Amino acid sequence: MTWFTPEVIDVIISVVKAIVILLAVVVAGALLSFVERRLLGWWQDRYGPNRVGPFGMFQIAADMLKMFFKEDWTPPFADKVIFTLAPVVAMSALLIAFAVIPITPTWGVADLNIGLLFFFAMAGLSVYAVLFAGWSSNNKFALLGSLRASAQTVSYEVFMGLALMGIVVQVGSFNMRDIVEYQAQNLWFIIPQFFGFCTFFIAGVAVTHRHPFDQPEAEQELADGYHIEYAGMKWGMFFVGEYIGIILISALLVTLFFGGWHGPFGILPQLAFFWFFLKTAFFIMLFILLRASIPRPRYDQVMDFSWRFCLPLTLINLLVTAAVVLLNTPAAAVQ
């Protein structure tokens, strides 16, 4: 009797895939800080980091060494357990959310029938990390930043979910692979669900607290917001977690609206990973371009925009999609 039964081999392969994907995401999140600075320098007609190594390519290694050797200080007035737990929860929730994203037909961690719901569960868990960080720091600026962040995240997650309901109505499934395969046989959802895409993208920027929705970390108002008391690797986990969030939202946009691993018009299906990577990289660059080109609005304007613009748009999109699907459904199937 051998231990390496087909079931055991499948488990080992799944674990190896999970480790490879999660390590790749963490490394990519760290590298994005360098990529962002280089792109911002290019767009703003300056050099950016260009001193460490050829073309500044070793700058990220220098930053990581600096962060690693910094004092991992915990304020004496902080709740030490929750203060330490917050960055772990923040980064873990984002990494676990990657489990349901299919990168290629064969590469993915978990093929869940409730993939979309699982993503929203993990996204909601990240709110607790922000609240933990702000409250446990025992700092008024950190607390105000965490309250801003949690209110903003919860508000925009509502529209993020409603924006995807049009896709669920058309496909009839919460499974990510089903959504990708549906787009392979029909139009990519960027066309029939354009308004849902717009709302999801806006909500994605807001949920990741990226510019122009970075009010929870506004330096001029809150002195860096909910992670003001963090230093060393704890701060580094929040820092890298922000870039992992960008990768996550970009990968979701590709999966849900741009055909996932499929190329345009089914071109070169054997290059599945290339198409997924190329489309994800485009949206990552778009996130960075927003930081370089759009001013930061006031917090009340951000919240007003969410409830007065995003909510009606998502509801109209959902109602129109439901009506179109109902009209195209045979009467016998409806009964």
UniProtKB/Swiss-Prot annotation:
The keyword Protein transport does not apply. The chain crosses the membrane at residues 11-31, 81-101, 114-134, 154-174, 187-207, 238-258, 270-290, 309-329. It is found in: Cell inner membrane. It is a multi-pass membrane protein. It catalyses: a quinone + NADH + 5 H(+)(in) = a quinol + NAD(+) + 4 H(+)(out). GO terms for biological process: aerobic respiration. Keywords: Cell inner membrane, Cell membrane, Membrane, NAD, Quinone, Translocase, Transmembrane, Transmembrane helix, Ubiquinone. Belongs to the complex I subunit 1 family. NDH-1 is composed of 13 different subunits. Subunits NuoA, H, J, K, L, M, N constitute the membrane sector of the complex. This is NADH-quinone oxidoreductase subunit H.
